[in-house]
Each structure stands twice: as C-alpha cells, then as structure tokens.
C-alpha cells in the first residue's frame, strides 16, 4: 500500500486541543494517555489511548517507560507518511514523552519529520519539562544522526491558549500544504533534502533546529543563519532568492487551490535560534524559583501540649 503524503500525529493534551481543528485533513490522528482531553468534536475513529494509563500528571519520568513500548503498535496502526508532522506540548507529561518517542522512531526509520510544539510557562515543573523535552529532542538528533526540526509556538503570559492554538493551526496547515506534492517544481525529494539537510551537507552537525514559518519575505529574511529554506509562491514572477542557506527549494502553487493560505509562504530552518529559546525558558524558571525561595514556612498549629493520637487526630 502506498504511503499517505502527509501524516499528522497529535499527542497529549496540546495535540488533542490543536488537532481537533484540523480534522479536515484525512491523515491526522490522535494519541493520549487518558480520555479527559477527548471532546464530542473529536473523531473517535482517529483517537488512540495508551493502555494502563490515566494521564501523566506532568510526570515525564513516570510516563516514558509505560508509553515507549506502545508507540510501535500505534505506528503500525497509523504508518508514517512521505512527510510527518508531530504535534505536542513541551511542558506536560503525556505529549512531551509520546511526541519525542514518535519522532525518535520515525528518525530511526529514515522518515522525514517536523515537530510543531508549544512551551508551557505556568509553573516551575512545567518549565522544567520544557527544558528536559528540548534536551531530549537534541539527544534524539545526536542518537539518530538526523536534525530534529521544531516549529515552536512561544507561550506568553496573558495570551490565551486559544490564540496560541491559532498560530499552531496555521503553521500545521502550511506544512500540510508544503508537503502535499501538488506544487510545480517541488517534488518529494526536494522536501526530504530540505528537512534532512545533513544528508547532502554532512559538514553540518545534526542537532535540534528551529523552523520559522512566514507569509512575508522580509520577515523570513530576518531569520539569522538560515540552513535550509523552502518557499511557495502563487505567482512565479515574485520569486526572489534571499538569505545564505545550504539548501533552497521552491514550489509554485496553483492560485485556484482551496488550500492556498497566502500568495507566498517561507519555511526557514536554523539552529542558532534554539539557544535563545532554551535560554528564555531557563531564565523564566529561575525567576519563578527566585520568587518561591522567599516563601515562608509557617509554624505548625499543633503543639506539644495537644492530645494527639498516633494517626494524627487531636481529641
């Protein structure tokens, strides 16, 4: 059986929330550790719940050995596509383990894959998960000798998750469009060599990289030290080369395509931006810890004169 063109794997609570808005794509599926993120809007035929789990409680260390052996069966049920998008949150306990395990399995199998992920900033344990998940993705890149490319949705205090989800939905839609194999001049190997740029340029160290998606050439041009660029143009006469990438590929879209999101789209991969992302999350965690260290431990309201039983009752 031939592969689907673009498979989308939506993992954990973040993946469930984002993916429910993209079910128009026939090759999108969900995986989570409990049913608490499943709503009436989810197509249950696409939902895979891991066995022996009732959520993760943001505990990645607890969850990893439970879900790791279940992912191969999930991938057998929903095989990889020519291109694969893995969607998850960095800061939880389910998606941040399921997602990287899927990425690792796909990378080991030589599949093309990109990640769309969102950080969490609401607690120190969440920020620590963000940090550890990024480190995990860097580790997967080193272990598989393949770059791991993430489109990161930045979580900002005061911005509702619904707004962040909109950015993720647009970016996933854009990636589905890019990898649809329906653009003039853009074939499957062009996409493979763009996302797996170290195949042809082995002087570049495989590591965690960041994918910047924009419908504005000026904005795309501002991405520092671009390694690989893919662009879509609805009007071939507007094609303009920019940046200093190792890899550049271009597709010309059909203006009548209902999936046309903009007259141009640019997908720029670099690695230098990961350092600032990692630094920002680390700084936010340190700021929370600095505030928490000033918390006061109150004195106990029980004292030695209370008539207290061995099991804690005061009578």
From Swiss-Prot:
It catalyses: GTP + H2O = GDP + phosphate + H(+). It is an enzyme of class 3 (hydrolase). GTP binds at residues 13-14, 93-95. GO terms for cellular component: host cell cytoplasm. It is found in: Host cytoplasm. The record marks 187, 190 as: GTP hydrolysis. Pfam families: TubZ_C_2 (PF22334). One of its GO terms (molecular function) is GTP binding. Its EC number is 3.6.5.-. SUPFAM superfamilies: Tubulin nucleotide-binding domain-like (SSF52490). Homomultimer. Polymerizes in a strictly GTP-dependent manner. Belongs to the FtsZ family. PhuZ subfamily. A tubulin-like GTPase that forms filaments, which are required for positioning viral DNA and capsids in the middle of the host cell for optimal replication. The motor component of a partition system which pushes phage DNA (encased by protein gp105) to the center of the bacterial host cell. Also required for movement of phage capsids to the vicinity of the DNA and rotation of the encased viral DNA at midcell. Forms filaments during the lytic phase, which position phage DNA at the center of the bacterial host cell. This is Phage tubulin-like protein. It comes from Pseudomonas phage PhiPA3 (Pseudomonas aeruginosa phage PhiPA3).
